Structure formats: C-alpha cells, structure tokens
Amino acid sequence: MRGDDRHNGGYCAPPARLPVPALTAILELRKVRKQYGDTVVVNDLDLQVHRGQCFGLLGPNGAGKTTTLRLLLGLTTPAGGSLTLCGEPIPERAPQARMRVGVVPQFDNLDPDFSVIENLRIFGRYFGLSSAVIERRVPALLEFARLENRANAQVRDLSGGMRRRLTVARALINDPDLLIMDEPTTGLDPQARHLIWERLKSLMASGKTILLTTHFMEEAERLCNYLCVIDGGRKIAEGKPHDLIDSQIGCDVVEVYGDELDTLRGSLTPLAERTEMSGETLFCYVREPAPLLAALHGQSGVRYLHRPANLEDVFLKLTGREMRD
C-alpha cells in the first residue's frame, strides 16, 4: 500500500494512535531473561528494532526465538530485564502495545467457516475498528494479497499460498506499527514463497517495520537489512547480512562431493583457508580459488561446486551442523 492510501480510503490510520518517534526503537529488550525451572531459555538478551527495518531473528530449533516472541508480546513474563514495544512497557501494558502490532503466526489460524473477506472483517473487529474503517481498508488488503477475485471464496477452498497471503493481509488490518512474522513461508512451494517475498518487499518499500523469524537463510538474506543470531537464549552475532558474511566467512566456498574425500581433504587443505567435512560433503573455504579448482579438475569420481559464501555458511559456522530437535 502507498502512503497516500491512508487518506484515500485504502488504509486509514486509527484516530487515537500516538506515533512512535522515528528515531527511537520500536522494540527494545534489555538484559531480558526467562527460565522454566532450572532451564534458562532466554539469557540476558539485548535487542533493538528500529522503525523501517526488516529485522531477522535467527537461530536453530530450541534457540529461544519463540519464547522471545512470546516475551515481547507480553504472553509470558520475564524473570529479569526490561522490554518496551511501541513505546509501551511490557508486560504491564502489553494489551495496549498489541493493538499496534500485526502478527503472522507460523501456522495459519484463519477461520475455515468464513470467506476471505469475512476473515478480514472479523479480525478488524478484534481491534475495535469501526465497520466504516474496515470497509475502507479491505479492498486494499485484498489487492495486496492478490485475492480480489477470491473475496467471497471459503478459506478451505484456498491454496496454501493464498491462505498465507490472506494471513499476512489480515495482520495488516489494524495498520500496525510493527509486523511480526514467524516462519512466514514454511511449507510453501517456491512460486508461493517468491510471491510472499514480493509482497513483503512492497511493505518494506512503504516503510513498514518487520520482525521476521525464519529457517530459510535465503529468505533472511533477501529480505532483512539487519540480523540477530541467537543460540541457547544468547545473542551470538548481529549485523547486516553481507557484513556478517564478510566478517564470519570472508571468502568463496567450494563444495566437493565424491569418493575418498578424507584422502582428498589432505591434499586440498593447504590450498584453503580451512576445510570442513559434513556428511558426504567436503567444504573448502578459499580466498584464491584457482589453485584448489585446478587441483580438483580431472579428479575421477569427484564433483564440486564453486560459489560465493552466503548466510547459510554463517549460520552453520555460528550454530554448528548438528541436528537440533
């Protein structure tokens, strides 16, 4: 939606809303701690999300991402530290803060007994919006979700990608200061995923602030302009995606597949900054790839892929390659 849609009937701001100052953090956690029994799940966590950012919160399973989201929404109480959301202290004024937030949960919770347009209307009432305001916003949201021609369709008849787009549109019904998205494209095929990315980029272009959790590193690299990686409830790295790639990896990657990789690794190690075995793949990190590629050329029973380093390399370096439950 364009900014002028707020005044031409597409997207009308709630009259009682107080603006969040542009130069302050829209979300801030300071030394936040949460534990269940003896298990610490969020450990002195500091975060700041500023207006206009697409902020990625990354971490393996069990890192504390879901608990962090619950804490910032006031759905669970911290054991220590302080939180503010949209200028409100959390959890003391969590209900007021949540009125200025849109949430896209990991799993769709649309009402299957209602149509697309009815899902939008009902959700608008949860925020106390008048029927007039809701009716002004719905057409723009249907257009945003590319569901103009499915407004009266039942949710049960929509594809997975359509349901996900409707969930995002529904989270925008209150014109939120912050949009929180938990694994927004999990379970979608590539075409549906790319369409969601396109819609999110249009939100970012309009200045919307987004907090995103995802296990798709390509998604984080494409969408986010700032990232925080957590593990064990602690922040272990933060920065812009390409800055993290440069500082943590800083070179090209050659993936090698084939026979007798342990033997081959010995001859390739002197040609690389470092090497790493993971399953049936040898990873070689190289600043000058030509000598290593020359050594691989003509090797029988060996395949290889030379590529730039990416955010997945960073994530695996920081959190390890072991499977997490």
Swiss-Prot record:
Keywords on record: ATP-binding, Cell inner membrane, Cell membrane, Membrane, Nodulation, Nucleotide-binding, Translocase, Transport
Residues the entry annotates as binding ATP: G59, P60, N61, G62, A63, G64, K65, T66
EC number(s) stated in the UniProt entry for this protein: 7.6.2.-
Membrane topology: Peripheral membrane protein
PROSITE patterns linked: ABC_TRANSPORTER_1, ABC_TRANSPORTER_2, NODI
Functional note: Part of the ABC transporter complex NodIJ involved in the export of the nodulation factors (Nod factors), the bacterial signal molecules that induce symbiosis and subsequent nodulation induction. Nod factors are LCO (lipo-chitin oligosaccharide), a modified beta-1,4-linked N-acetylglucosamine oligosaccharide. This subunit is responsible for energy coupling to the transport system.
Protein name per the record: Nod factor export ATP-binding protein I
Encoding gene (name): nodI
